[in-house]
């Protein structure tokens, strides 16, 4: 027998996974696919159909993602308690089950209040998935320091994989829903995403259990003042506020520019593919930069990605159709390659500058700041788009916010982490 008397029956599987950090990171990355892509990013694929079907204003459509972000903020604020009470691995898996259920239930309603409530609940539970997974991947990366950047990159690249899954599933379900005569064809997509989320949760269960995590400790003297990393935190707030406008409304803007469903799907897949390979693109930078430089670079690139569609929505008649298409694909490629790494950059900053006993608390702070930015972003972009020149103006404002975030993050210098 290979098991000790107090080992669970599955300990051989878990022990094997503990010796396979890359495979473990891939399993954990499904949490990013679920908590970020299915729960949050997929909504952009529903926006054009829901707007056409329900006649909602951009403000109302944006408010659905604001509700999701509010739930995410509440989940982030309670994250330390949840992880202390249930452990990172359990909160990761339980959050995955609940998030999947709430996603599926979105297909049962057409009232904005009901859908908004479910978006709030899915945001609340997805915080345990995404941020809980962040704690797990930080522990895994700490145990394998020579591959730290790669492991962090793999985890956050799960968002790209999830985007590809969404791009393949949601348009297909919209077509099938229409062919089957459903009154609201987009509802089928929510059912399928819920089922997909449950499958992902099952697949990430064992990898999450294989990461050895000591219970988080809370002491009165073991803390680092937030002012020490206020600049990168402010830059991360701007990231949350700026990126979400693009993510919420890019498909609606492309539809306004005359793109058909096939082109929209190809564009979204492009973002997902670049996100999937962002681990290889950014792994060295995540290991090299100890301060806010990585986030500053990413915010700058994301701002450029926002400016491109904003510019062509205002002045597209001055360029040929092919030029517009190529530039928009460049925008999507930049956005996909940078999106997940912005989050990874803050995790890397925490790992580089804080002792392990402070990781949960610091991740909670960064997640809460990020979520606050996400609350403001979609509704602001939607309101501007309804009242001040359309989606183009909203995208330009998002770019300005991201440029400000880049400047703030650049000011952040590393500091010597005390011994754990």
List PLM regions with ranges.
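Cytoplasmic helix-loop-helix junction between adjacent transmembrane helices
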Residues: 118-158
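A late C-terminal transmembrane helix in Major Facilitator Superfamily
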Residues: 351-388
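Extracytoplasmic gate region of multi-pass secondary transporters
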Residues: 43-44, 228-269, 273-276
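Conserved MFS/SLC helix-loop-helix module at the cytosolic interface between two early adjacent transmembrane helices
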Residues: 74-110
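Helix-to-loop junctions at the C-terminal end of transmembrane segments
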Residues: 75-87, 278-291, 385-386
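C-terminal transmembrane helical hairpin of 12-TM major facilitator-type secondary transporters
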Residues: 292-346
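C-terminal membrane-cytosol helix-exit motif in multi-pass small-molecule transporters
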Residues: 170-171, 194-214, 408-412
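Paired small-residue
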Residues: 102, 113-122, 326-334
């Amino acid at each position: 027998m290979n098991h000790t008397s107090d080992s669970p029956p599955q300990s051989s599987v878990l022990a094997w996974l503990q010796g396979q950090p890359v495979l473990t990171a891939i399993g954990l990355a499904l949490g990013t696919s679920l908590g970020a892509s299915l729960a949050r990013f997929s909504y952009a694929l529903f926006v054009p159909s829901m707007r056409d079907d329900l006649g909602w204003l951009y403000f109302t459509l944006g408010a659905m993602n604001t509700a999701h972000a509010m739930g995410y903020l509440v989940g982030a604020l309670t994250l330390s308690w949840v992880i202390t009470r249930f452990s990172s691995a359990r909160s990761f898996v339980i959050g995955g089950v609940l998030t999947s259920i709430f996603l599926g239930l979105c297909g049962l309603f057409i009232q904005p209040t009901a859908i908004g409530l479910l978006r709030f609940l899915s945001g609340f539970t997805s915080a345990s998935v995404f941020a809980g997974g962040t704690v797990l991947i930080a522990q895994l990366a700490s145990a394998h320091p020579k591959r730290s950047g790669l492991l962090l990159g793999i985890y956050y690249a799960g968002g790209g994989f999830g985007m590809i899954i969404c791009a393949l599933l949601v348009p297909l379900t919209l077509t099938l829903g229409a062919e089957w005569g459903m009154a609201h064809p987009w509802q089928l997509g929510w059912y399928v995403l819920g089922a997909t989320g449950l499958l992902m949760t099952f697949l990430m269960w064992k990898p999450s259990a294989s990461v050895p995590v000591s219970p988080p400790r809370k002491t009165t003297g073991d803390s680092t003042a937030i002012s020490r990393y206020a600049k990168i935190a402010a830059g991360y707030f701007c990231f949350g506020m700026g990126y979400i406008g693009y993510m919420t409304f890019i498909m609606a803007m492309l539809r306004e520019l005359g793109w058909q469903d096939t082109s929209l799907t190809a564009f979204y897949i492009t973002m997902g593919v670049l996100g999937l390979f962002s681990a290889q693109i950014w792994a060295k930078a995540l290991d090299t930069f100890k301060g806010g430089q990585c986030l500053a670079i990413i915010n700058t690139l994301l701002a450029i990605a926002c400016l491109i569609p904003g510019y062509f929505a205002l002045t597209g008649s001055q360029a040929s159709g092919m030029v517009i298409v190529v530039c928009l694909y460049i925008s999507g490629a930049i956005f996909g390659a940078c999106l997940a790494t912005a989050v990874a950059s803050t995790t890397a900053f925490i790992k580089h500058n804080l002792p392990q006993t402070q990781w949960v608390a610091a991740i909670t702070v960064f997640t809460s700041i990020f979520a606050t930015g996400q609350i403001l972003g979609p509704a602001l972009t939607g309101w501007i788009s309804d009242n001040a020149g359309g989606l183009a103006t909203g995208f330009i404002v998002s770019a300005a916010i991201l440029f400000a975030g880049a400047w703030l993050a650049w000011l952040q210098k590393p500091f010597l982490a005390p011994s754990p």
